[in-house]
Amino acid sequence: TCALPISTDGTAYVKDSTVTTDSKGGAGLFAYGDGTVYAADTDITTQQDTSGGIHAAGGGKLYAWDLNVETNGESSAAIRSDRGGGTMVVDGGTYTSNGVGSPAVYCTADIAVNNAELTANGSEAVCIEGLNSLRLYNSNLTGNMSDDDQNDTTWTVILYQSMSGDSEVGNSTFQMDGGTITSKNGGLFYTTNTECTIALKDVDITYNDDSEFFLQCTGNNNQRGWGQSGANGSDCNFTADSQDMKGNVIWDSISDLDFYMTNGSTLEGAFVNDESNAGNGGDGYCNVVIEKDSTWTVTGDSTITSLSNAGTITDADGKTVSIVGIDGTTYVEGDSDYTITVGSYQDSADTSASTTVDDWSSYEVERPESL
């Protein structure tokens, strides 16, 4: 069968079907405007460019159970949203994209996914633009983005504002509870030219050997038209809850980063201030808050604006790391080879501004009897 577009006031129920498209822009299932699609136990394959597997835009609503989706073109996310946003709730299923620039999930809507396999074989795993949200529950997420000279770096999940007009400017949200992330190339999380909230809870992460960072929160070189050079940083609230992490956290002075480690979280890495894309600089910061029972294992000299530590900070050999103020004050004298340089330091941790991951039950939709 062909693509199924749904427009104003329309409702469609799709069950035990096969949907295939072989034309540019041929989405599998498409909900638009006041339209709603309910779909279950269906195979969807798209072959050409700009052909999402399941697609919502203009406020459309799409609810899916146990679909098997594969896309093969460029700009063809398996779960795709577009200008005007909408709502997508996915429960179970397998979603695979094979093209360049085709993430498993392209998010310019409010999307929640539970117990699904999400794989991008030729792209980053997730793109989130602007005032939109993606919440993943007990799902397995894989990305394999190729290096590109137009980009400052390579990533697995990006939260950004492209300035294309496809999404309203505002805070991007990424939450993940359980499940796995597999990064086959590049760093893990990259955020630029936006405001965002990232929260991870007990996610099992597999890194590639060339991973350059765990989180990069910086401006960009504007080769892609993402904001104004020297003023296109990111304001990011990052929370790790019962989360093991590995890799550097990179930030710059045109970005604001609040980094919270809670409930026994661990980080093996360094905090690196990199002004490469910060122009003349700004008043940005990197504030790190480490709760009791959380641990930072330092792997290199680090620079932080404010460090609030009620947990444990050592190097990989268990040696105490020196914590020194930019004014020369020694807050902690250690025997490690590494030093943490801070603007301010305290040995307590206020995590009241951290993010609590929402429950799947807040987004779960009852499957219609007709499906």
Locate predicted features.
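A generic tandem-repeat structural signature
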Residues: 10-75, 79-81
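Solenoidal tandem-repeat scaffolds enriched in leucines and small polar residues
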Residues: 52-177, 182-183, 188-189
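Long, acidic/serine-threonine-rich intrinsically disordered regions with weak helical/coil propensity
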Residues: 160-161, 165-178, 183-202, 206-228
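Surface-exposed loop/turn segments connecting beta-strands in extracellular beta-rich domains
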Residues: 21-24, 46-49, 71-74, 97-100, ...
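Intrinsically disordered, low-complexity terminal regions
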Residues: 118, 130-134, 141-142, 146-150, ...
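Short, small-residue-biased leader/transition segments that mark boundaries at the very start
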Residues: 1-4
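All-beta strand scaffolds that present successive hydrophobic residues in beta-strands
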Residues: 11-16, 36-42, 61-67, 87-92, ...
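Extracellular beta-strand/loop-rich repeat segments of large surface/secreted proteins
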Residues: 252, 256-370
